[in-house]
């Protein structure tokens, strides 16, 4: 996902959907901006090597947003997600599962891992 922004793909990727709390969209714009700025500073100041992408998914599925994070190692992905649990923004998350995490593989490697009929 970060490669869409011109960043080289990392070896590990985590993708998950999420839905904001019902009251999130009733907060003043300034408050939401403040909360999200603090949330971003919290995670990416400690994990600047982790690259993230956010996709709005309103009306396309059961989720409002889809997030993707990429890192060179699995522990960096786990670290940033765990670190982000301790922010005010977490008070405004209704659902943020399921998580899909895996290492980057080539299409050939992926095909070779598939069950044979």
Residue map of PLM features:
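Short S/T/G/P-rich N-terminal loop/turn motif that feeds into the first structured element of a domain
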Residues: 1-45, 58, 72, 79, ...
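Residues that flank catalytic or metal-binding motifs in active/ligand-binding sites
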Residues: 12, 63, 95
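An amphipathic, aromatic/His-enriched active-site/gating alpha helix that lines ligand/cofactor pockets
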Residues: 45-47, 72-101
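A short linear hydrophobic-aromatic micro-motif
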Residues: 49-56
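A short beta-turn/loop motif at secondary-structure boundaries
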Residues: 56-62
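Terminal substrate-recognition subdomain of acyl/acetyltransferases
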Residues: 104
